[in-house]
């Protein structure tokens, strides 16, 4: 993540974002609204070895937290430059329970749902 921030965002000043969005009149408001990519979107497509239950089950490893909670920093970084978040696609349990055909079918359904 740091490398992405260093190489993409830092060099993207003036191309990806103009400022942090705050105004001189009231510098406590408007933070995160200076992105230049308004109207564009981003979508995460992720693979995890963890089974879905590790995310969804209270008391399990991720304490019932959705994958997007774990990637909130990345979503907010993209929002900072003006991108709108699309629903994340997630393949779980990819090492101990590999199901390539299911993942491909699920991805196709996801793409059709998101992009029509």
Q: Could you say what each language-model-derived stretch is?
A:
Residues 1-74:
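Helix-loop-strand module that forms the ligand-binding subsite of alpha/beta enzymes
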Residues 53-116:
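Glycine-rich phosphate/pyrophosphate-binding loop and the adjoining helix
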């Amino acid at each position: 993540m740091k490398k992405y921030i260093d190489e993409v965002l830092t060099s993207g000043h003036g191309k990806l974002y103009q400022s942090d969005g705050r105004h001189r009149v009231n510098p406590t408001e408007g933070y995160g609204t200076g992105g230049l990519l308004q109207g564009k979107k981003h979508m995460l497509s992720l693979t995890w070895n963890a089974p879905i239950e590790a995310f969804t089950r209270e008391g399990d490893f991720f304490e019932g937290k959705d994958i997007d909670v774990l990637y909130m920093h990345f979503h907010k970084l993209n929002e900072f430059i003006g991108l709108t978040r699309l629903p994340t696609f997630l393949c779980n349990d990819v090492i101990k329970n590999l199901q390539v055909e299911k993942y491909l079918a699920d991805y196709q359904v996801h793409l059709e749902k998101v992009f029509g």
